[in-house]
Amino acid sequence: MAGLFYLGGRDHNKQDHHQEKDHNEDKSNNYLYLYKDEIYNNNKGFEIFPPQYFQQQQQQNHAAAPTNLYSFGMVPSGGNINNNRSTNRSLYFNVVSDHEPVRSSTGGFTVTRQGNMNCQDCGNQAKKDCPHMRCRTCCKSRGFDCQTHVKSTWVSAAKRRERQAQLAVLPAKRIRDANSRGGGDDDDDDKEDEKNDSCGGGSALACTRVVNASSSGLETSHLPPEISSPAVFRCMRVSSIDDEDEEYAYQTAVSIGGHVFKGILYDQGPSSDHHRYSSSLNGETSHQHHLNLMDSTPSAATTNAVTAVNTNNGSIDPSSLYTAVATPFNAFVAGGTPFFASSRC
């Protein structure tokens, strides 16, 4: 440890002090100093300065009432002024007293680092502009009305990442909500109406959604937009899950473009109430066709099948076809079109 150290006290040489008390009362100030060697840029040991040195320092200071100042400092020695290691710290203890009765003695304990100011209570880094020289926690715990210690705006990294993730998802969620509340209502109503029309509003086991045959996708699958081909319809008895009443329907299967299409046709009521519309290839004209199930040949009853033709000879009772099961159904229809019988029948 190197620096300047001067030791003096009120009780030093009590006899001389009592003799000169009345004559030199203003010179009774005594000091205890420890100076860091980096201030003077030397590596000298302890040096004892005469009292005249401190008298000169006192004359240079601002004129004030007689005070007693005790200052004590501890610093580690170091010969290099550019040494900025973390161990280069200072420890001070200051006690300032005044002879005036109005001003009371004050004391403080401060641990400082180079360029920083530490809290006088806990030793943590204090706020730069805090007049009480304390950190936010200690300043609030003591109840100081400090305007420097406002609410902290610092957010941890985990909270920032969580908030950024929420903000990234929020725009997409708003778009979905806007679509569901906005134009999605009319589209849903149209889909429901189309579904009800295709199902006929009755107790059906399956519903078929009809789309425009001229839409895109037919070119890639090489399927014709419209075809006219004979088909064999097999009468069958069906019942709904919700409704115990049974009804009759017709099942068929055709081969178009190397693909097998099969389905069930349900009873939609009298032919005068339901019409089937079809459009031509160019979309300029539309024709209305009535689908009537005819008994064209006597063999239709024995094979339990009906051929659909565009004639108006009359309808056949489906129940008679269902009860007249004599021979197994032919696996192939006319024209070489294969038929795959359902396992339900």
Curated annotation (Swiss-Prot):
UniProt-annotated binding residues for Zn(2+) 1: C119, C122, C130, C135
Swiss-Prot/TrEMBL keywords: Activator, Auxin biosynthesis, Auxin signaling pathway, Developmental protein, DNA-binding, Metal-binding, Nucleus, Zinc
Inactivation phenotype: No visible phenotype.
Entry annotated with the keyword Metal-binding: yes
Tissue note: Mainly expressed in the filaments of flowers, the shoot apex regions and pollen. Also present in leaves.
Family designation: Belongs to the SHI protein family.
Protein name: Protein SHI RELATED SEQUENCE 7
